[in-house]
Amino acid sequence: MPFWDTSALVKLYVREHDSDRFVELARRSETRATISQLSIHEMRCVLHRKEFARAIPPNTAELAYREFYNDVQDAVLKLIPYGRDVALEFDRIVRVCYRARPVVPIRALDGLLLASALTARMPDLVSTDLRMRDAGLLLGLRIFPS
């Protein structure tokens, strides 16, 4: 199973116009979805931001977060812990992205998530975030959806 960025992962827990595509991608996989330990915190923020923006119904954020967190606790999702190996890979990723021509202006959290994926030797990335996808391509990951 590919590494799931939060931009795609959230579609498994709240209904969005393209959620079915991501649910099917997860369903077809032979292994568990893999996420970063940091995704746990980002997911809470993303869900509340969507609720605030009225992209999801009121009182949905906490319910969706509980479902997600239960999946983390029950090992439905494979968790990559944050550690020194991820931090060192992050440093390398920042250099690669900002030395590339054209530059890929990666954000800190995206770099940490990509470092988690690469440290865990994940060859594939599921993301809807354009910067994350660009950085993933630069780093040699296969990007889904294509």
What kind of region is each of these model predictions?
Residues 77-130, 134:
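Active-site neighborhoods of divalent-metal-dependent phosphate/nucleic-acid chemistry enzymes
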